[in-house]
């Protein structure tokens, strides 16, 4: 539309070949674009990217049972902001000097790449696997029954509560 946003949705009912909607029906849209700085997925949907992307700032907001698979290297030159809620899932390779993650519900985050400064909250029954995502400086809160695994190089501030479990590799200074 006129604000530079692409909205994809189903308006009304779609009848498939077998004349009824069922759980096996899938609808696919293939889109080619040159820039991407904001992704918002809600409900039961999936986004797969192919190739490398570069942007100044990237915001990803996944909710419901949405899924995003990054099939190349995604470079956010200034800031990366990821919010996952519900049973959402994000997997791929991302790089940014500054990253903020808010993972809640039963969501899953699995990243490769790296960041310099990272703030993270992992709660509920969520999982964050950042063992292949080196972080120079991490400030993290892990709560509920969440699980998080990090690779930290320089400094770490880590707080856990409830039945949460957090592990890290590296030899950072504990703040």
Positions of the model-derived regions?
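Short, surface-exposed interaction patches in beta-rich subdomains
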Residues: 79, 90-175
């Amino acid at each position: 539309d006129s604000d530079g946003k692409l909205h994809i949705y189903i308006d009304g009912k779609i009848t498939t070949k077998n004349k009824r909607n069922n759980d096996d029906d899938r609808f696919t849209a293939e889109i080619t674009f040159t820039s991407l700085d904001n992704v918002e997925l809600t409900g039961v949907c999936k986004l797969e990217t192919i190739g490398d992307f570069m942007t100044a700032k990237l915001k990803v907001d996944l909710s419901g049972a949405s899924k995003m698979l990054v099939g190349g290297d995604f470079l956010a030159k200034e800031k990366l902001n990821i919010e996952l809620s519900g049973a959402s899932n994000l997997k791929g390779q991302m790089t940014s000097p500054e990253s903020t993650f808010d993972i809640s519900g039963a969501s899953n985050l699995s990243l490769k790449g790296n960041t310099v400064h990272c703030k993270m909250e992992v709660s509920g029954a969520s999982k964050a696997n950042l063992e292949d995502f080196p972080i120079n400086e991490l400030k993290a809160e892990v709560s509920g029954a969440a699980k998080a695994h990090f690779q930290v190089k320089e400094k770490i501030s880590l707080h856990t509560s409830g039945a949460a479990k957090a592990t890290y590799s590296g030899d950072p200074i504990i703040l």
